[in-house]
Protein backbone atom coordinates (compact mmCIF):
# COMPACT_ATOMS: atom_id res chain seq x y z
CA UNK A 1 0.00 0.00 0.00
CA UNK A 2 1.43 3.38 -0.98
CA UNK A 3 1.38 6.52 1.19
CA UNK A 4 -0.25 9.92 0.58
CA UNK A 5 -1.87 9.03 -2.73
CA UNK A 6 -5.33 9.98 -4.04
CA UNK A 7 -6.80 7.31 -1.74
CA UNK A 8 -4.99 8.56 1.38
CA UNK A 9 -7.09 7.94 4.55
CA UNK A 10 -9.97 6.60 2.43
CA UNK A 11 -10.31 3.10 3.85
CA UNK A 12 -13.21 1.59 1.88
CA UNK A 13 -15.01 1.79 -1.45
CA UNK A 14 -17.86 3.79 0.04
CA UNK A 15 -15.37 6.38 1.30
CA UNK A 16 -13.87 6.71 -2.17
CA UNK A 17 -17.30 7.37 -3.64
CA UNK A 18 -18.27 9.87 -0.94
CA UNK A 19 -14.96 11.73 -1.29
CA UNK A 20 -15.80 12.47 -4.92
CA UNK A 21 -18.67 14.57 -3.55
CA UNK A 22 -16.59 16.70 -1.19
CA UNK A 23 -13.07 17.00 -2.57
CA UNK A 24 -13.83 20.04 -4.71
CA UNK A 25 -15.91 21.85 -2.11
CA UNK A 26 -14.74 25.36 -1.14
CA UNK A 27 -13.51 26.12 2.37
CA UNK A 28 -15.33 28.19 4.99
CA UNK A 29 -12.61 28.67 7.62
CA UNK A 30 -14.60 30.29 10.38
CA UNK A 31 -11.87 30.30 13.05
CA UNK A 32 -8.13 30.84 12.65
CA UNK A 33 -5.26 32.95 13.95
CA UNK A 34 -3.98 34.42 10.70
CA UNK A 35 -2.93 38.06 10.75
CA UNK A 36 -5.15 40.14 8.41
CA UNK A 37 -2.21 42.49 7.84
CA UNK A 38 -0.26 39.62 6.29
CA UNK A 39 -3.17 38.91 3.97
CA UNK A 40 -3.58 42.53 2.91
CA UNK A 41 0.12 43.24 2.40
CA UNK A 42 0.47 39.88 0.63
CA UNK A 43 4.05 39.28 1.61
CA UNK A 44 6.00 37.04 -0.75
CA UNK A 45 7.81 34.33 1.21
CA UNK A 46 11.38 33.60 0.16
CA UNK A 47 12.28 31.01 2.80
CA UNK A 48 10.35 27.86 3.64
CA UNK A 49 11.19 28.08 7.34
CA UNK A 50 9.39 31.42 7.68
CA UNK A 51 6.31 30.01 5.97
CA UNK A 52 6.30 26.46 7.31
CA UNK A 53 7.99 26.39 10.73
CA UNK A 54 7.69 29.94 12.04
CA UNK A 55 5.14 30.21 14.84
CA UNK A 56 4.03 26.58 14.50
CA UNK A 57 3.95 25.31 18.07
CA UNK A 58 2.74 21.87 16.93
CA UNK A 59 6.07 21.37 15.17
CA UNK A 60 8.07 23.00 17.99
CA UNK A 61 6.53 20.67 20.58
CA UNK A 62 7.38 17.65 18.45
CA UNK A 63 10.96 18.82 17.90
CA UNK A 64 11.53 19.22 21.64
CA UNK A 65 10.27 15.67 22.13
CA UNK A 66 12.95 14.53 19.68
CA UNK A 67 15.76 16.16 21.64
CA UNK A 68 16.23 19.14 19.33
CA UNK A 69 17.92 22.11 21.01
CA UNK A 70 15.92 25.30 21.45
CA UNK A 71 18.48 27.10 19.28
CA UNK A 72 17.30 24.98 16.33
CA UNK A 73 13.62 25.52 17.16
CA UNK A 74 13.08 29.15 18.15
CA UNK A 75 16.67 30.32 18.60
CA UNK A 76 19.52 31.70 16.49
CA UNK A 77 20.27 28.63 14.33
CA UNK A 78 20.19 29.19 10.58
CA UNK A 79 17.07 28.44 8.59
CA UNK A 80 18.76 25.43 7.00
CA UNK A 81 19.74 24.06 10.41
CA UNK A 82 16.15 24.49 11.65
CA UNK A 83 14.78 22.77 8.56
CA UNK A 84 17.17 19.83 8.98
CA UNK A 85 16.24 19.58 12.65
CA UNK A 86 12.58 19.38 11.73
CA UNK A 87 13.30 16.75 9.07
CA UNK A 88 15.17 14.67 11.69
CA UNK A 89 12.07 14.89 13.83
CA UNK A 90 9.49 14.28 11.13
CA UNK A 91 11.06 11.04 9.93
CA UNK A 92 10.45 9.59 13.42
CA UNK A 93 6.97 11.08 13.95
CA UNK A 94 4.83 8.19 12.71
CA UNK A 95 1.36 8.35 14.26
CA UNK A 96 1.45 12.08 14.95
CA UNK A 97 -0.88 14.24 12.82
CA UNK A 98 2.03 16.58 12.03
CA UNK A 99 3.48 13.72 9.97
CA UNK A 100 0.35 13.56 7.84
CA UNK A 101 -0.18 17.32 7.61
CA UNK A 102 3.42 17.89 6.57
CA UNK A 103 3.32 15.24 3.86
CA UNK A 104 0.08 16.70 2.47
CA UNK A 105 1.45 20.25 2.52
CA UNK A 106 4.66 19.26 0.77
CA UNK A 107 2.85 17.32 -1.94
CA UNK A 108 -0.27 19.39 -2.53
CA UNK A 109 1.25 22.87 -2.27
CA UNK A 110 4.82 22.34 -3.46
CA UNK A 111 4.66 19.17 -5.54
CA UNK A 112 7.18 17.33 -3.34
CA UNK A 113 6.28 13.63 -3.47
CA UNK A 114 9.28 12.34 -1.53
CA UNK A 115 9.12 11.65 2.17
CA UNK A 116 11.12 14.35 3.98
CA UNK A 117 14.04 12.84 5.90
CA UNK A 118 17.33 14.00 7.32
CA UNK A 119 19.18 12.60 4.31
CA UNK A 120 17.22 14.59 1.71
CA UNK A 121 16.45 17.64 3.86
CA UNK A 122 19.05 19.98 2.38
CA UNK A 123 18.10 19.21 -1.21
CA UNK A 124 14.38 19.64 -0.48
CA UNK A 125 15.06 22.82 1.49
CA UNK A 126 16.71 24.46 -1.53
CA UNK A 127 14.05 23.10 -3.88
CA UNK A 128 11.26 24.56 -1.73
CA UNK A 129 12.96 27.95 -1.54
CA UNK A 130 13.38 27.96 -5.31
CA UNK A 131 9.69 27.10 -5.68
CA UNK A 132 8.71 29.99 -3.40
CA UNK A 133 10.69 32.48 -5.46
CA UNK A 134 9.79 31.08 -8.87
CA UNK A 135 6.06 30.92 -8.16
CA UNK A 136 5.95 34.05 -5.97
CA UNK A 137 4.10 32.24 -3.19
CA UNK A 138 2.11 34.68 -1.05
CA UNK A 139 -0.89 34.51 1.30
CA UNK A 140 -3.50 35.53 -1.26
CA UNK A 141 -2.39 32.89 -3.71
CA UNK A 142 -2.40 30.18 -1.05
CA UNK A 143 -5.90 31.26 0.00
CA UNK A 144 -7.20 31.36 -3.58
CA UNK A 145 -5.60 28.04 -4.55
CA UNK A 146 -7.34 26.40 -1.57
CA UNK A 147 -10.70 27.91 -2.59
CA UNK A 148 -11.17 29.61 0.77
CA UNK A 149 -14.37 31.67 0.68
CA UNK A 150 -14.39 32.95 4.27
CA UNK A 151 -11.74 33.52 6.94
CA UNK A 152 -12.60 34.31 10.55
CA UNK A 153 -9.56 35.82 12.25
CA UNK A 154 -9.12 36.19 16.03
CA UNK A 155 -8.94 39.79 17.20
CA UNK A 156 -8.38 41.85 20.34
CA UNK A 157 -11.44 43.89 21.44
CA UNK A 158 -9.47 47.13 21.09
CA UNK A 159 -8.20 46.38 17.59
CA UNK A 160 -8.87 49.18 15.10
CA UNK A 161 -9.68 46.53 12.47
CA UNK A 162 -7.66 48.62 10.03
CA UNK A 163 -6.59 45.62 7.96
CA UNK A 164 -10.06 44.10 7.84
CA UNK A 165 -11.37 47.40 6.52
CA UNK A 166 -8.68 47.53 3.85
CA UNK A 167 -9.39 43.96 2.79
CA UNK A 168 -13.12 44.65 2.61
CA UNK A 169 -12.45 47.62 0.34
CA UNK A 170 -10.10 45.64 -1.93
CA UNK A 171 -12.28 44.45 -4.81
CA UNK A 172 -9.43 42.37 -6.23
CA UNK A 173 -9.58 39.99 -3.26
CA UNK A 174 -12.76 37.90 -3.19
CA UNK A 175 -12.35 36.01 0.09
CA UNK A 176 -14.27 37.51 3.02
CA UNK A 177 -11.96 38.16 5.98
CA UNK A 178 -14.08 38.87 9.06
CA UNK A 179 -12.90 39.81 12.56
CA UNK A 180 -13.76 37.73 15.61
CA UNK A 181 -14.21 39.41 19.01
CA UNK A 182 -11.86 37.70 21.52
CA UNK A 183 -11.96 39.39 24.97
CA UNK A 184 -9.52 37.27 27.01
CA UNK A 185 -8.33 40.32 28.94
CA UNK A 186 -11.86 41.08 30.18
CA UNK A 187 -11.47 38.43 32.88
CA UNK A 188 -9.88 39.40 36.18
CA UNK A 189 -7.31 36.60 36.36
CA UNK A 190 -5.64 37.85 33.18
CA UNK A 191 -2.32 39.54 33.85
CA UNK A 192 -3.27 42.46 31.55
CA UNK A 193 -6.76 43.04 33.01
CA UNK A 194 -6.02 46.40 34.68
CA UNK A 195 -4.17 47.72 31.64
CA UNK A 196 -7.04 46.54 29.46
CA UNK A 197 -9.57 48.49 31.53
CA UNK A 198 -7.50 51.66 31.15
CA UNK A 199 -7.19 51.26 27.40
CA UNK A 200 -10.86 50.31 27.04
CA UNK A 201 -11.83 53.54 28.80
CA UNK A 202 -9.52 55.54 26.55
CA UNK A 203 -10.77 54.09 23.28
CA UNK A 204 -14.46 54.35 24.23
CA UNK A 205 -14.02 57.68 26.04
CA UNK A 206 -15.92 56.24 29.00
CA UNK A 207 -15.07 56.41 32.68
CA UNK A 208 -15.11 52.78 33.77
CA UNK A 209 -15.70 52.65 37.51
CA UNK A 210 -17.79 49.54 38.09
CA UNK A 211 -19.31 46.46 36.48
CA UNK A 212 -22.09 48.24 34.59
CA UNK A 213 -19.82 50.88 33.06
CA UNK A 214 -17.39 48.11 32.10
CA UNK A 215 -20.13 46.20 30.28
CA UNK A 216 -21.34 49.40 28.59
CA UNK A 217 -17.83 50.00 27.26
CA UNK A 218 -17.60 46.41 26.07
CA UNK A 219 -20.88 46.81 24.20
CA UNK A 220 -19.46 49.80 22.37
CA UNK A 221 -16.58 47.66 21.13
CA UNK A 222 -18.92 44.82 20.17
CA UNK A 223 -21.01 47.29 18.17
CA UNK A 224 -17.84 48.54 16.45
CA UNK A 225 -16.89 44.99 15.48
CA UNK A 226 -20.42 44.37 14.20
CA UNK A 227 -20.19 47.47 12.01
CA UNK A 228 -17.02 46.04 10.48
CA UNK A 229 -18.27 42.63 9.44
CA UNK A 230 -17.82 40.60 12.62
CA UNK A 231 -19.94 37.46 12.75
CA UNK A 232 -18.50 35.71 15.79
CA UNK A 233 -16.85 35.97 19.17
CA UNK A 234 -14.43 33.59 20.81
CA UNK A 235 -13.15 32.91 24.31
CA UNK A 236 -10.92 30.33 25.97
CA UNK A 237 -11.71 29.13 29.48
CA UNK A 238 -9.62 26.73 31.53
CA UNK A 239 -12.84 25.49 33.14
CA UNK A 240 -16.55 26.05 32.63
CA UNK A 241 -17.86 27.58 35.84
CA UNK A 242 -21.18 28.82 37.15
CA UNK A 243 -21.07 30.81 40.36
CA UNK A 244 -23.51 33.67 40.68
CA UNK A 245 -23.24 36.81 42.78
CA UNK A 246 -24.75 40.29 42.90
CA UNK A 247 -23.60 43.52 41.29
CA UNK A 248 -22.49 44.94 44.63
CA UNK A 249 -19.90 42.19 45.03
CA UNK A 250 -18.87 42.53 41.38
CA UNK A 251 -18.29 46.25 41.83
CA UNK A 252 -16.25 45.67 44.96
CA UNK A 253 -14.21 42.98 43.22
CA UNK A 254 -13.63 45.18 40.18
CA UNK A 255 -12.26 48.02 42.27
CA UNK A 256 -10.06 45.78 44.40
CA UNK A 257 -8.48 44.10 41.37
CA UNK A 258 -7.87 47.48 39.75
CA UNK A 259 -5.97 48.45 42.91
CA UNK A 260 -3.73 45.37 42.74
CA UNK A 261 -5.71 42.72 44.64
CA UNK A 262 -5.12 39.10 43.55
CA UNK A 263 -8.54 37.38 43.35
CA UNK A 264 -9.14 33.89 44.71
CA UNK A 265 -10.67 31.07 42.65
CA UNK A 266 -14.23 31.70 43.83
CA UNK A 267 -13.97 35.36 42.90
CA UNK A 268 -12.51 34.46 39.51
CA UNK A 269 -15.46 32.11 38.92
CA UNK A 270 -18.02 34.72 39.94
CA UNK A 271 -16.50 37.30 37.59
CA UNK A 272 -16.25 34.80 34.74
CA UNK A 273 -19.89 33.80 35.17
CA UNK A 274 -21.19 37.36 35.31
CA UNK A 275 -19.07 38.75 32.47
CA UNK A 276 -19.66 35.82 30.14
CA UNK A 277 -23.41 35.93 30.69
CA UNK A 278 -23.48 39.65 29.89
CA UNK A 279 -21.32 39.10 26.83
CA UNK A 280 -23.64 36.33 25.64
CA UNK A 281 -26.59 38.71 25.97
CA UNK A 282 -24.73 41.20 23.78
CA UNK A 283 -23.57 38.57 21.31
CA UNK A 284 -27.16 37.50 20.79
CA UNK A 285 -28.22 41.14 20.36
CA UNK A 286 -25.57 41.75 17.69
CA UNK A 287 -25.92 38.37 15.98
CA UNK A 288 -22.50 36.94 16.88
CA UNK A 289 -21.93 33.20 16.91
CA UNK A 290 -20.30 32.58 20.31
CA UNK A 291 -17.32 30.23 20.26
CA UNK A 292 -16.18 28.68 23.54
CA UNK A 293 -12.85 26.85 23.68
CA UNK A 294 -12.36 25.17 27.02
CA UNK A 295 -10.13 22.73 28.83
CA UNK A 296 -6.63 24.02 28.05
CA UNK A 297 -4.09 24.17 30.85
CA UNK A 298 -1.65 26.71 29.46
CA UNK A 299 2.01 27.71 29.81
CA UNK A 300 3.01 24.79 32.02
CA UNK A 301 6.76 25.00 31.40
CA UNK A 302 7.33 28.28 33.22
CA UNK A 303 10.91 28.75 32.01
CA UNK A 304 9.97 28.45 28.35
CA UNK A 305 6.89 30.62 28.91
CA UNK A 306 8.97 33.37 30.53
CA UNK A 307 11.46 33.25 27.68
CA UNK A 308 9.18 32.85 24.65
CA UNK A 309 5.69 33.83 25.81
CA UNK A 310 2.39 32.05 25.19
CA UNK A 311 1.46 29.60 22.42
CA UNK A 312 4.90 28.05 22.08
CA UNK A 313 4.11 24.37 22.71
CA UNK A 314 3.97 23.93 26.50
CA UNK A 315 0.21 23.59 27.00
CA UNK A 316 -1.88 20.59 28.06
CA UNK A 317 -5.42 19.36 28.08
CA UNK A 318 -7.02 19.80 31.48
CA UNK A 319 -9.75 18.24 33.57
CA UNK A 320 -12.38 19.65 35.88
CA UNK A 321 -14.96 18.73 38.47
CA UNK A 322 -18.70 19.12 37.78
CA UNK A 323 -18.40 20.09 34.11
CA UNK A 324 -21.94 19.09 33.18
CA UNK A 325 -23.45 20.65 36.32
CA UNK A 326 -21.83 23.99 35.53
CA UNK A 327 -22.46 23.81 31.81
CA UNK A 328 -26.15 22.95 32.21
CA UNK A 329 -26.60 25.67 34.83
CA UNK A 330 -24.91 28.27 32.63
CA UNK A 331 -26.91 27.42 29.52
CA UNK A 332 -30.18 27.23 31.44
CA UNK A 333 -29.55 30.63 33.00
CA UNK A 334 -28.88 32.11 29.55
CA UNK A 335 -32.13 30.63 28.26
CA UNK A 336 -34.12 32.06 31.17
CA UNK A 337 -32.66 35.51 30.49
CA UNK A 338 -33.31 35.19 26.73
CA UNK A 339 -29.55 35.62 26.26
CA UNK A 340 -28.57 32.36 24.57
CA UNK A 341 -26.77 33.08 21.28
CA UNK A 342 -25.79 30.55 18.66
CA UNK A 343 -22.77 28.83 20.19
CA UNK A 344 -19.94 26.49 19.22
CA UNK A 345 -18.39 24.54 22.09
CA UNK A 346 -14.88 23.15 21.55
CA UNK A 347 -13.86 20.59 24.15
CA UNK A 348 -10.13 19.85 24.47
CA UNK A 349 -10.33 16.70 26.61
CA UNK A 350 -11.94 13.85 24.63
CA UNK A 351 -12.95 12.16 27.89
CA UNK A 352 -15.77 14.71 28.08
CA UNK A 353 -17.03 14.41 24.48
CA UNK A 354 -20.19 12.45 25.25
CA UNK A 355 -20.97 14.65 28.26
CA UNK A 356 -20.61 17.84 26.20
CA UNK A 357 -22.64 16.55 23.24
CA UNK A 358 -25.31 15.29 25.63
CA UNK A 359 -25.50 18.63 27.47
CA UNK A 360 -25.77 20.68 24.29
CA UNK A 361 -28.69 18.49 23.19
CA UNK A 362 -30.69 19.85 26.14
CA UNK A 363 -30.71 23.38 24.73
CA UNK A 364 -31.31 23.06 20.98
CA UNK A 365 -34.87 24.40 21.06
CA UNK A 366 -35.25 27.58 18.99
CA UNK A 367 -37.97 29.22 16.92
CA UNK A 368 -35.56 30.46 14.23
CA UNK A 369 -35.34 27.17 12.39
CA UNK A 370 -31.60 26.92 13.08
CA UNK A 371 -30.34 23.36 12.81
CA UNK A 372 -28.23 22.53 15.86
CA UNK A 373 -28.39 26.02 17.36
CA UNK A 374 -25.67 24.91 19.78
CA UNK A 375 -22.82 23.24 17.89
CA UNK A 376 -20.38 20.70 19.25
CA UNK A 377 -17.19 21.97 17.63
CA UNK A 378 -14.62 19.87 15.81
CA UNK A 379 -11.78 18.19 17.65
CA UNK A 380 -9.58 21.01 18.88
CA UNK A 381 -5.79 21.32 19.26
CA UNK A 382 -4.61 18.06 20.85
CA UNK A 383 -7.83 16.42 19.63
CA UNK A 384 -7.26 17.66 16.06
CA UNK A 385 -6.22 14.13 15.10
CA UNK A 386 -7.77 11.15 13.35
CA UNK A 387 -8.90 9.56 16.61
CA UNK A 388 -9.87 12.94 18.07
CA UNK A 389 -12.08 13.72 15.09
CA UNK A 390 -13.70 10.29 15.20
CA UNK A 391 -14.33 10.58 18.95
CA UNK A 392 -16.01 13.96 18.49
CA UNK A 393 -18.14 12.72 15.58
CA UNK A 394 -19.11 9.55 17.44
CA UNK A 395 -20.34 11.58 20.41
CA UNK A 396 -22.21 14.03 18.20
CA UNK A 397 -23.83 11.30 16.10
CA UNK A 398 -24.96 9.36 19.17
CA UNK A 399 -26.15 12.35 21.21
CA UNK A 400 -27.24 14.83 18.53
CA UNK A 401 -27.30 15.40 14.77
CA UNK A 402 -24.05 14.76 12.91
CA UNK A 403 -25.75 15.83 9.66
CA UNK A 404 -25.98 19.39 11.05
CA UNK A 405 -22.29 19.57 12.07
CA UNK A 406 -20.49 22.68 10.75
CA UNK A 407 -17.29 20.75 10.20
CA UNK A 408 -13.64 21.67 10.12
CA UNK A 409 -11.68 24.83 10.89
CA UNK A 410 -7.92 25.36 10.80
CA UNK A 411 -7.52 27.24 14.14
CA UNK A 412 -4.04 27.90 12.76
CA UNK A 413 -1.41 30.58 12.30
CA UNK A 414 -0.15 29.06 9.04
CA UNK A 415 -1.26 29.78 5.47
CA UNK A 416 -0.47 26.16 4.62
CA UNK A 417 -2.99 24.70 7.07
CA UNK A 418 -5.88 24.49 4.63
CA UNK A 419 -4.71 20.93 3.93
CA UNK A 420 -6.31 20.09 7.28
CA UNK A 421 -9.73 20.59 5.70
CA UNK A 422 -8.90 17.90 3.14
CA UNK A 423 -7.52 15.66 5.89
CA UNK A 424 -10.78 16.05 7.82
CA UNK A 425 -12.88 15.39 4.72
CA UNK A 426 -11.04 12.15 4.02
CA UNK A 427 -11.54 10.98 7.61
CA UNK A 428 -15.20 12.03 7.47
CA UNK A 429 -15.77 10.04 4.27
CA UNK A 430 -14.15 6.93 5.74
CA UNK A 431 -16.27 7.36 8.88
CA UNK A 432 -19.52 7.62 6.89
CA UNK A 433 -18.32 4.94 4.48
CA UNK A 434 -17.92 2.47 7.33
CA UNK A 435 -21.58 3.00 8.21
CA UNK A 436 -22.49 2.02 4.64
CA UNK A 437 -20.05 -0.90 4.43
CA UNK A 438 -21.24 -2.33 7.75
CA UNK A 439 -24.92 -1.96 6.89
CA UNK A 440 -25.62 0.58 9.63
CA UNK A 441 -27.23 3.04 7.20
CA UNK A 442 -28.88 2.57 3.79
CA UNK A 443 -26.54 2.42 0.80
CA UNK A 444 -27.88 5.77 -0.37
CA UNK A 445 -24.96 7.68 -1.83
CA UNK A 446 -27.12 10.63 -2.75
CA UNK A 447 -28.21 11.14 0.87
CA UNK A 448 -24.83 10.38 2.45
CA UNK A 449 -23.00 12.37 -0.23
CA UNK A 450 -25.23 15.35 0.45
CA UNK A 451 -24.58 14.97 4.18
CA UNK A 452 -20.82 14.89 3.61
CA UNK A 453 -20.98 18.02 1.42
CA UNK A 454 -23.03 19.83 4.05
CA UNK A 455 -20.55 19.00 6.79
CA UNK A 456 -17.60 19.93 4.59
CA UNK A 457 -18.91 23.38 3.67
CA UNK A 458 -22.59 24.28 3.41
CA UNK A 459 -23.60 23.84 7.05
CA UNK A 460 -21.01 26.41 8.11
CA UNK A 461 -22.15 28.84 5.42
CA UNK A 462 -25.73 28.57 6.64
CA UNK A 463 -24.83 28.74 10.34
CA UNK A 464 -22.80 31.94 10.04
CA UNK A 465 -25.40 33.87 8.10
CA UNK A 466 -26.41 36.92 10.13
Swiss-Prot record:
Its EC number is 5.3.1.12. It is an enzyme of class 5 (isomerase). One of its GO terms (molecular function) is glucuronate isomerase activity. The keyword Protein biosynthesis does not apply. GO terms for biological process: D-galacturonate catabolic process; D-glucuronate catabolic process. It catalyses: D-glucuronate = D-fructuronate; aldehydo-D-galacturonate = keto-D-tagaturonate. The keyword Transport does not apply. Pathway: Carbohydrate metabolism; pentose and glucuronate interconversion. Keywords: Isomerase. HAMAP family: UxaC. Belongs to the metallo-dependent hydrolases superfamily. Uronate isomerase family. This is Uronate isomerase. The lineage of its organism: Bacteria, Bacillati, Bacillota, Bacilli, Lactobacillales. The gene is uxaC.
